[in-house]
Amino acid sequence: GTTNLARGLSPAVACLSVSDNGMFSGTLAAVVKHLYTGETYSATRGGGATLNGRQIKIAVLRQARSALISIDISKTPNLDRITPLLSHCRYIRMLGSSATELSLIASGTLDAHIDIRGTVRATDVAAALHILAEAGGTYSTDGSVGADFPLTREATMELVAASRQPLLDELLTLTKP
């Protein structure tokens, strides 16, 4: 999203999360502000997720073939892992902002997001990932479903997130090394 913002291209967001232990599992609250639309996503631990103050939930279950999926393939060293996804899934988009895409899954607009470059910074997606989890979504970092991770600028990961576990499992199978 940084390049989007620098160029004046929507979407771009500002994110903030608070953790009591420096790990994702310690996240107490999170906010994602969509800078061009003014939408504000937020969540507190155990309190669910909201969009502009209204409770949100993830979309109904879809199979990968009919799901609306966002991906980031810029500078992807392992395009061979994306090929099965491209041939299997019908609705693929690239928005250029993982935090935006995660919040859109939380509100039911998107069904999944895939970024297997290994360069997603934990601090760039932590707030949106917390909101997604509080809305009922699920995720995998570096191939581990629901894994904890440190909230440091140096911590990077592969990220696959989805509205429901069966969809996440299908996407992990399609993109496995």
Where does each model-flagged region fall?
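An extended, acidic
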Residues: 46, 56-177
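Short secondary-structure boundary micro-motifs
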Residues: 1-2, 24-26, 32-33, 78, ...
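DPxDG-like acidic metal-binding loop motif
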Residues: 3-46
